[in-house]
Amino acid sequence: MFVNIRRDLHQIPELGFQEFKTQQYILDYLATLPSERLQIKTWRTGILVRVHGTAPTKTIGYRADMDGLPIDEQTDVPFRSTHEGRMHACGHDMHMAIALGVLTHVVHHPIRDDMLFIFQPAEEGPGGALPMLESDEMKQWMPDMILALHIAPAYPVGTIATKEGLLFANTSELFIDLIGKGGHAAFPHETKDMVVAASSLIMQLQTIVSRNVNPLDSAVITIGKLTSGTVQNVIAERARLEGTIRTLSPEAMEKVKGRIEAIVRGIEVAYDCQAHIDYGSMYYQVYNDETLTNEFMQFVEKETDVHLVRCQEAMTGEDFGYMLARIPGFMFWLGVQSPFGLHHAKLNPNEEAIDVAIQLLTRYVTWKGNHKVKEEER
């Protein structure tokens, strides 16, 4: 059933804050469930679903992101995307299907505590977690703890991976516009060539990690797109660099940004041009609560047959970090065993992982949500 839900959602990927079909699909499914314990709110294109417990002392939050990516799908599956230039290439279709599976179980098999299911838009950009967290709708239903997962193509089905503390990096988009003076290729001395300026800037940016960041820290600066020029015999008046910054600490992020700004000022002087920097969307690090994460890992090892890997931190960016900065909780990787990675046009995760995740999470939230009962019975 939830594999079919995943396939339905896979066919209708939508970009951030445009998830209208996705939102309606989830609302239509929720309407088929018994409503006695359900409360539903919408926030922009997101959804909050509160499942009331039998004798709540806390609220357990579970977050699933909803948006797709601007990628042309290149798989040959019969349920491939029907939206041209859009694809669920980061597994958010699976995230939603798993959340609905857990939600359905809790509705039919109530636990003591309340649960809040958060279907969050715009994880890929411009970022939905922070504004959703600050919304009146969520403030009224703020959970006491929160958890989430992310699919991991590199891990086999039946495996999850996580760790206490830092799991994902601080990330920031990076956009730099250079403005010079165009002209005929035969008269370069009368121009200010922004292709040359951009080339120099890209090379200088690479020295930040190697010469300005402590080798014991971690940072990555990637320029993934360079746009400049019109035709081969015209010197480019403008250039635009687009990329990302990733660091394992907020302090390193500030240092990297400071060096970028200093280098860009030097480019302005050296190439007699103007430059503008925009950092775009910025995501805070995913930092797992040590007590809750350790408790979860012990539960997985003792109470399930799921294989647990204690992984290292990754340079991945996730706006779930904003939620973890305010609500204790954790995130983990779910193995889906795909030869193609996240954000790849041929990503094809193994759907058997959906049932693995639903069974694991329903057992965990049932244990966690009834934990007070067990303590009182001792």
Swiss-Prot record:
Entry's family note: Belongs to the peptidase M20A family. N-acetyldiaminopimelate deacetylase subfamily.
Gene Ontology biological-process entries: diaminopimelate biosynthetic process; lysine biosynthetic process via diaminopimelate
Calcium listed as a keyword: no
EC primary class: hydrolase
Taxonomy of the source species: Bacteria, Bacillati, Bacillota, Bacilli, Bacillales
Name assigned to this protein: N-acetyldiaminopimelate deacetylase
Reactions this protein catalyses: N-acetyl-(2S,6S)-2,6-diaminopimelate + H2O = (2S,6S)-2,6-diaminopimelate + acetate
GO MF term (any one): N-acetyldiaminopimelate deacetylase activity
InterPro entries: AcetylDAP_deacetylase, Amidohydrolase, Bact_exopeptidase_dim_dom, Peptidase_M20, Peptidase_M20_dimer
Superkingdom field: Bacteria
Assigned EC number: 3.5.1.47
Active site: D65, E124 (proton acceptor)
